[in-house]
Amino acid sequence: MSTNQETRGFQSEVKQLLQLMIHSLYSNKEIFLRELISNASDAADKLRFKALSAPELYEGDGDLKVRISFDAEKGTLTISDNGIGMTREQVIDHLGTIAKSGTKEFLAALGQEQAKDSQLIGQFGVGFYSAFIVADKVTVKTRAAGEPIDRAVLWESAGEGEYSVADIEKRERGTEITLHLREEEKEFANEWRVREIIGKYSDHIGLPVEILAKEYDEEGKETGIKWEKINKAQALWTRSKGEISDEEYKEFYKHLSHDFADPLLWTHNKVEGNQEYTSLLYVPSKAPWDLFNREHKHGLKLYVQRVFIMDDAEQFMPNYLRFMRGLIDSNDLPLNVSREILQDNKVTAALRKALTKRSLQMLEKLAKDDEEKYLQFWKEFGLVLKEGPSEDFANKENIAKLLRFASSKNDSSEQTVSLEDYVARMKEGQKAIYYITADSYIAAKNSPHLELFNKKDIEVLLLSDRIDEWMLSYLTEFDGKQLQPITKADLDLGDLADKEQEEQKEQDKTFSSFIERVKTLLGERVKDVRLTHRLTDTPAVVSTDNDQMTTQMAKLFAAAGQPVPEVKYTFELNPEHHLVKKVADFADEDEFANWIELLLEQAMLAERGSLENPTAFIKRVNNLLG
């Protein structure tokens, strides 16, 4: 008998997600059982953890398990566990809403085609809601550990916008989920179909999964039914690597992460000695949609002596490796460990150092052994890895080896060139690694600063991600070579400089009065005016000194709402260009001023991508064209 019944509406995001999920995951519908068994396993883990300090929560039943039964006539499938259970408030919070930050924005941004992508929807960890793929009604009965028998909860919904919740009596602790299968999904009320799915998806979890199976005598006659354990029920990471198949590793990843896609790669290690722990680390094949959300939960599952302690233990991985998934099972941490204790703990620090090293080694090996697969990783997680040099000084060189960039040598925006590739191709006498940062690949590729380098066939790395300038303020050298921006006024090409410099000096003398005239005109608006011989097709550029903030860094500061120091540019004019020669001969001061202003505005536009007064620029161009 139920009491205190009420009907409530789903949060709008839940309604939207249910519809998207039912349509996008239908072709892979059997995963609902994996999701529900995973949830049951998590509930058991949480009970074990709470019972460390409150053993009475076991209520005399510490034999944790998942049980699956079905009724072919009624067309129902029931998954029950004796784990932690839920209170009424938790039922409403967990089954009626999605608390994930950014959910509304994510769903709003989903296009019709994207909505059909099961991997995209699967990133959500849809868990419980996957039941509605095969059921037209779902009934949940649950009682939280430690709650009295009459404080259990009944939850029911047809998945169409509302659900009901009521108080009931339930003797057994834990959660029981009954799926009222759609007419066309009655195959899931079949013992052998259920056995097949569990063998495929859930054989590896550490909790016994039992099925209510028929018993037969020697003649094959049915004699009754009994609960039969049908999985190995041994935590996968505790088994030896040699006896675990790739398929088992992949399915365990999906159980662990609730991801629908296979992982890209993994590493499984057991360490003994000063520290004793087992780690199983995965690199996903796809980045989660909220990877750059500040509230994005990340980190490893933490076990101590095979007892689950917590999800999302971020203390074991640096932030730039937040895409890593997996678990660590330590023998050295106390069972009563908390997030606060983990924060300032020598064991945690040692484990973090070891796991970071292990992760970077795994990526380095992938880059060496399978370039195509590594570039697949880079497309998904390269931006995050670029945060590394600013966060992890100790591993800066190793992170640098993993970075990939676009290059002036490739006619493509694809980031495929490593710093090691670049160094191996450096010209004889070249002492620096040259790069340019810009708002986009196109802007970098067509920058006038590249003209001299193209002429001399010197490779330049083309950087256009917002984080690049920040990263390079920490990554200033590689393999003993300085990383040098080509946009600096005092660019030093060393032994690669023109041998005809003496001739240029003589030529420059003839323009000395012209330069003084430009300086007088522009005054304090520029830091300096000089001639340049690094341009071939462009009349003028602007550049910054080594001790000045670059244009891209200034933009980064401005975008972050930080105060930006004034950047004064050096105005460089190409004496070989016909326009500069023409302007140098103008006697009329107004005409001279108009053309110099135009050349400066053009140079500023090429450098910054915008002008403070574009209307004046357009007016000037129109006047000169007229």
From Swiss-Prot:
Read off the CDD domains from this record: HATPase_Hsp90-like
Q: Which domain of life is it from?
A: Bacteria
**Does the UniProt entry include the keyword Chaperone?**
yes
Q: Where is this region: A?
A: 1-339
Q: Which InterPro entries match?
A: HATPase_C_sf, Heat_shock_protein_90_CS, HSP90_C, Hsp90_fam, Hsp90_N, Ribosomal_Su5_D2-typ_SF
Q: Supply the SMART domains for this chain.
A: HATPase_c
| Keywords of this entry | ATP-binding, Chaperone, Cytoplasm, Nucleotide-binding, Stress response
* One Pfam entry name: HATPase_c_3
GO terms for cellular component: cytoplasm
User: Which residue ranges does the record annotate as region B?
Assistant: 340-555
Region C: start and end of each range?
556-626
UniProt-annotated location(s):
Cytoplasm
Instruction: Give any GO molecular function from the UniProt entry.
Output: ATP binding
Q: What does this protein do?
A: Molecular chaperone. Has ATPase activity.
Q: Which family does it belong to?
A: Belongs to the heat shock protein 90 family.
On subunit structure and binding partners, the annotation says: Homodimer.
Output this protein's name. Answer: Chaperone protein HtpG
Please report the organism this UniProt entry assigns to the protein: Histophilus somni (strain 2336)
Supply the gene name. Answer: htpG
